[in-house]
Amino acid sequence: MRQRGFTLLEMMLILLLMGVSAGMVLLAFPASRDDSAAQTLARFEAQLRFVQQRGLQTGQFFGVSVHPDRWQFLVLEARDGADPAPADDGWSGYRWLPLRAGRVATSGSIAGGKLNLAFAQGEAWTPGDNPDVLIFPGGEMTPFRLTLGEAPGIAFNARGESLPEPQEAQ
């Protein structure tokens, strides 16, 4: 008589799907207003990793627009013929739009406006509508360091790797 049951491969696939589902659920929760700096930066890093992986899968360019009180992930889309490009736009034929990723949060905000973005080469940070950090389809990104108030920040190098020590991005 033949035994019936699940194979090891089927069990591993179920565990993988449960893990991915749990991760998506956690990213979909709205930000609580009393987050600590470490929690806020961890949420930003999780969103950044999600967008980085999405870029690897889809081949799209993404960006992050950082303001003192919030951040927003953006996607580079082709302009349609009815949408003229502004005269000072360096993205001829393309425009940055807020990223919509289903139920996954692609933005965040904090009370009090304490976010600070620093670049490896010492470039000045001027918050605006265009992205401050570019995320390329291969996973590379603009090197940066993000801090929240006086707490230690997070830093990433040009390869998109998190730097272990909170130091100037390389």
UniProtKB/Swiss-Prot annotation:
Stretches that traverse the bilayer: 6-29
Keyword Transport carried by entry: yes
Membrane topology: Single-pass membrane protein
UniProt superkingdom: Bacteria
GO biological process, one term: protein secretion by the type II secretion system
PTM comment: Cleaved by prepilin peptidase.
Keyword terms of this UniProt record: Cell inner membrane, Cell membrane, Membrane, Methylation, Protein transport, Transmembrane, Transmembrane helix, Transport
Propiece residue ranges: 1-5
Modified residues (N-methylphenylalanine): F6
Presence of the UniProt keyword Acetylation in the record: no
GO cellular component terms, semicolon-separated: plasma membrane; type II protein secretion system complex
Subcellular location: Cell inner membrane
Assembly notes: Type II secretion is composed of four main components: the outer membrane complex, the inner membrane complex, the cytoplasmic secretion ATPase and the periplasm-spanning pseudopilus. Interacts with core component PulG.
Family statement: Belongs to the GSP H family.
Entry-linked NCBIfam families: typeII_sec_gspH
Protein role: Component of the type II secretion system required for the energy-dependent secretion of extracellular factors such as proteases and toxins from the periplasm. Part of the pseudopilus tip complex that is critical for the recognition and binding of secretion substrates.
Protein name: Type II secretion system protein H
Organism name: Klebsiella pneumoniae
